[in-house]
Amino acid sequence: FACDDSGGSLRDISNDVTSLSVNVAQALIDITGLDKSAMERLVGLGDGSFSVSGVFNAASNKSHDVFKTRTGTRTVSYAIGGNTSTNPILTMECLVDSYNLAHSADGALTWTAGLQLQSGTTPTWSTV
């Protein structure tokens, strides 16, 4: 998992990530007329988001550096199985909508971040 920092440099933070959820959605537009007995729909706009969780890492160019400043567009890349040829990869231009820290009684410091599609370009899977 890699994400641009606020300066636009892509940073591989996969070592800090413990959980990741990807949502690639398609809006459906209801066009059902009163004369129908079932729904009619058209394909609407695509959307995408990431929900990411991890272990806090304050080292240079790691997760805290990437998410501590939430402004600006971020290129986000998720390659299933790593950056090995033919592995699936999803890349989107996103905005960071949240960066939250949690400190538990056992001393663990963890974070969650939400990233939402920004560019108006439909998210599509390709290969590394």
Predicted regions and their residues:
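Solvent-exposed edge beta-strands and adjacent loop segments
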Residues: 1-56, 89-114
